[in-house]
Amino acid sequence: MKNIIIFGAISVAYAQVSFSGNTETRLAESSSGYYYNETLINTNLQYDAFTNWIQLEYSDPPELGRGINGVRKMRLEYDNGPVKLKLGDLYEIWGRGLVLNSVDDQPIDRDTGIRGLTLMYNNPSFSTQVIAGKTDISQSTINALGFNNRTHNYHVSHNLYGLNIQKLLGNHDFGFSFLQGLEKHPVNTFPEDTLNLKNQLHSLSYSYMHSVFDFYTEYIMNRSYEFDEDRWSSHGKGKGLYGNLNLYFNLFSLNLEYINYRYAMIDPISRFNIVDYYGYNQPYQNPPVAVHIHENVLMNRISHQTDFNNEVGYKAELIGSFSDNIEFLSIFSQSNRTHSWVMDENFMWKKDKELSFLPKFDPAAMPFKDFYTELTFRTLQNKMFIKVGYADMKDIIDLLQNTVTDTSQSLTYSITDAQTIPLNFSYSFSNGWSIESKIELQWLSKGYWWYEEKNNQIIADSLMSIFLDDNGKRLDQEKNTFISFTVSKSPKWSLTLTSDKASVKESFLENKSIVNPLEKFLGIDQERNWVNVEFVYHITSSMRFSLLYGSLKGGLLCTNGVCRIIEPFDDGFKIGLSTVF
């Protein structure tokens, strides 16, 4: 009888417990010495109203960031009707992220998670959340010692607590958020090496839902204080506005987004200096951007990096269908800083004119604009898929000089200007075989634009390109070509050959790529081509193995306006193994 009772108790307990997880192992080594070996293990244990998440990492070293051998993240959750409690590593978003949007974006090694406690209460018309904890955020900057592209060299800690409230009245949703952080901010000044800061964020939000449209807006105020001897002194204040309007029609929808961030007005040279300029936009905010995040390789490499402290912009997105088999997408986005900038008689930057609440293409305000459109076709009973697009982007990266007198102006800035055509094609055969091809063509201009005017006469208005041919002659454009071709047999395996080609070399990049036997076998120029082949095999429905050999170009990788440079990978292997259990 005793054994029966014990067996019954174990059976009931087991029936109430569920366990799941996944693992991912990645190993790579190139001929240039680039090496990483990392394994991530996620486990989820659920018992009744409790859920436990643990992430283990074993890396020596990881692809990006510092090595960890042990527990990386953990969280315990209790969910009982309207009440939810979380303890451990928290990743939360309030509204659209103007006050709080903590993320773990491993492809660019960006982790703004909070280790602490949060308590939430929800019912159909009211919700509230309190949060308290600490976040240690690592970033890369050239303004601190030890900069490199693989490991962050600047580390800041924040002790946070805050409150978020949402109230629903019919179709109207009202919100209020408050978040305060006590920051330990390392600086390069003597005798102080760390500053004590207090950052406060307040926001009000409103949204409205309707059958044919929805609307959201949020206004945020920022105040920062610096502890000086025995009291808090005001350091800075700013504000921000975000708006989103979606219109729904029978065959298409229109999405409009607007940002107006005015946390700080920092000169063009120092605007990304996170060491010496502090108390403004915080890394745990991660608000929306007025930029389309391109999924195509060549367009993502030249993505616009948003200045979250000071940027005004909008994005208009039209999406719909001409028929059941033809869909379209068109996006236009534009932004600039809130003021234009000019140099004084000592060649020091100062604010010039405040611009309109809508952006315009004034080079002295470091503008950006991007147009993208695509058509998608599905035919032959959805066996054939074709997507063709066109992108036209222009981005003034840095303002280098702008001196203005009564009779003259001298203006110099760095600019990126590109036109890109992506084409995707796939065809699925009836026996499980399929083929897929991706082709991207890009005409890229990049360099320094010089404009000179005297006595109403234009003396110079031209681009000095950074692209050179083999004889050292400057070329107006670089042509980039990205091609991939995949053959697959569902559900077991796929084989992909990828070629990434540039027509010329940038004048400031002198490193020569290492000989890749695959490129040599194909008889292509190894200085301007990166070729690799990848084999993927599904061992079981829950286990996937991948093997890549060859070279990867690297370059800029951006997510939500935050960018990081990924180093090239020359003549090497990458091995991956992922499982789900």
Can you say where each PLM-predicted feature lies in the sequence?
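Outer membrane beta-barrel
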Residues: 45, 50-137, 245-268
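Surface-exposed coil loops of outer-membrane beta-barrel proteins
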Residues: 22-26, 88-168, 175-195, 275-316, ...
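Transmembrane beta-strand segments of Gram-negative outer membrane beta-barrel proteins
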Residues: 15-37, 45, 50-54, 83-85, ...
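Bacterial Sec-dependent N-terminal signal peptides
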Residues: 1-20, 577, 581
